Amino acid sequence: MEKKGTSVFSNGLIWFGAGVSLAEILTGTYFAPLGFGKAMAAILLGHLIGGLMMFAAGMIGAKERKSAMETVKMSFGERGSLLFAVLNVLQLVGWTAIMIYDGALAADGVLHTGIWVWAIIIGALIVVWIFVGLTNLGKLNTVAMTALFILSLVLFKVIFFGTGSAAPVVDDGSLTFGAAVELAVAMPLSWLPLISDYTREAEKPFAATLASVLVYSLVSIFMYMIGMGAAIFTGEYDIAQIMLKTGFGVVGLLIIVFSTVTTTFLDAYSAGVSSVSISSKIKEKWAAIVVTVIGTVAAIVYPMDNITNFLYLIGSVFAPMIAVQIADYFILKKADAEESAFQWRNLVVWLVGFVLYRVLMHVDTPVGNTLPDMVITVIVCVIVEKIAAAVKEK
């Protein structure tokens, strides 16, 4: 019997779950120094940039029916793609640990039973999500996401329309607009190496990809607003204290736990999918469970309070990688390079993009550093390919 494809609705639901997360709310709190107006502009611009990149990446996988790391083989070759598969698994293990740590820390701030207890509870729930499986998550996710959305709306109302707010924050110059844009791009960018793992199974590739990106972007913007609003109007940056200050007890706890589970499930699941790209002997589901266990143990053992450098490392690796894929697939329309071991030209172009990203980290631009890096990398990729084609014709 032919495997059932995922609907536009279920794809949208998956990415709704990705957007409703502690990571988005916590990142939103960083925007408070800009003041409300400039912070919102940076959030919107960053998500526009990140959303367009997500759509391009998701469409490649949706049209080719390939996972994210399988699409990487198309541009970098069978062996060349292993570098990105390994790096992707490592970043997903990192994200799994960070999300479980953040969720456990925040949950313990509401109900003091020990961070390690909450880490185990969250890890166990993620394993349940993995066992249920992507195509069978429809009803379970619908219930969980509807509840989370209602609770998020209540939290939004309390923060923005409640009484006893702190004095509004004005721009104090501690965060530049360009740096804020980069913080807004950071979350969509972190999903770039993952989105095709879900769009590849879509019944309607274009509609499912568009729905995934739009739903994620809108929900992520909303979550950023909650974090930013909490920091500006309540003067609080700690998620547990935000919940308590706004009058949430068990309700806040449910938001914390289930948003962490639904988001971290995507990280663990995609780590399993990427592991198959490294070795076909690996089973997706069991690899995802192993990643969840490792992430849970790491969340118990290691403190993970500052992830700025981790985000920049993700950007420097995957922004130029996706840029090369976009140039290859949409502009040059090159033949699939999967049969070759290495696609050396593209690997060199990626390295140029990687170095450029690290350099741009020290330059303040109005649009952050991801967009300039990707635009330049795309241009370099096209120029190199045109030169190579001209030389070959002679």
List where the protein language model places each region.
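Membrane-interface loop-to-helix entry segments
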Residues: 117-122, 126-159, 171-172, 209-216, ...
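Extracellular loop-to-transmembrane helix junctions
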Residues: 29-58, 80-82, 372, 376
